[in-house]
Amino acid sequence: MSGLTHFDAAGHAHMVDVGGKQETQRIAIARGTIRMLPATFALIRDGKAKKGDVLGVARIAAIQGAKRTADLIPLCHPLALTRVAVDFELDDALPGVHCVVQVETFGRTGVEMEALTAVQVGLLTVYDMCKAVDRGMVITDVSVREKRGGKSGDWKAEDVAG
């Protein structure tokens, strides 16, 4: 199981010991998209969804998702997050909504999982609030776009054209 930090020498899952690591500023940015019917997109854009302010509720859900990541992902460390910024971008061409989340902490381990969880929970909330009018929505392209800090240094995803 060489290279997989969540397994010990015997192949058993364990939480990685980060006690000896240096505390640094950690930042992760993740992104994802939900595609939908034009009529569903219009309801969100125009603020006319039956359940209320879809993106406002999804923003709060995404923040809560980042904060609760360690409760959902068994081997994640509980972290004291210093910032969770959630942005939704309406995309007429899809039609759909992009969710971009930046998570920050000052600690011994990264916040990539918190950023990914926040994106997923935000997009799942959009789905939940609109499923009565569009059960065919698709959540797609969820990924870490950038991470900063820590021993491994900074990393940025390269967009690969079709």
Swiss-Prot record:
One term of GO molecular function: cyclic pyranopterin monophosphate synthase activity
Catalytic activity as recorded in UniProt: (8S)-3',8-cyclo-7,8-dihydroguanosine 5'-triphosphate = cyclic pyranopterin phosphate + diphosphate
Top-level EC class as recorded in UniProt: lyase
Keyword Lyase: yes
Top-level lineage group: Bacteria
EC number assigned by the record: 4.6.1.17
Active site: 128
Any one of the GO BP annotations: Mo-molybdopterin cofactor biosynthetic process
InterPro entries: MoaC (IPR023045), MoaC_bact/euk (IPR047594), MoaC_sf (IPR036522), MoCo_biosynth_MoaA/MoaC (IPR050105), Mopterin_CF_biosynth-C_dom (IPR002820)
UniProt entry tagged with the keyword ATP-binding: no
CDD domains according to UniProt: MoaC_PE
Positions bound to substrate: 75-77, 113-114
Pathway: Cofactor biosynthesis; molybdopterin biosynthesis
Keyword set, alphabetical order: Lyase, Molybdenum cofactor biosynthesis
Pfam families named in the record: MoaC
Family: Belongs to the MoaC family.
NCBIfam families in UniProt: moaC (TIGR00581), PRK09364.1 (NF006870)
Biological function: Catalyzes the conversion of (8S)-3',8-cyclo-7,8-dihydroguanosine 5'-triphosphate to cyclic pyranopterin monophosphate (cPMP).
The protein's assembly and partners: Homohexamer; trimer of dimers.
Protein known as: Cyclic pyranopterin monophosphate synthase
Source organism: Burkholderia cenocepacia (strain ATCC BAA-245 / DSM 16553 / LMG 16656 / NCTC 13227 / J2315 / CF5610)
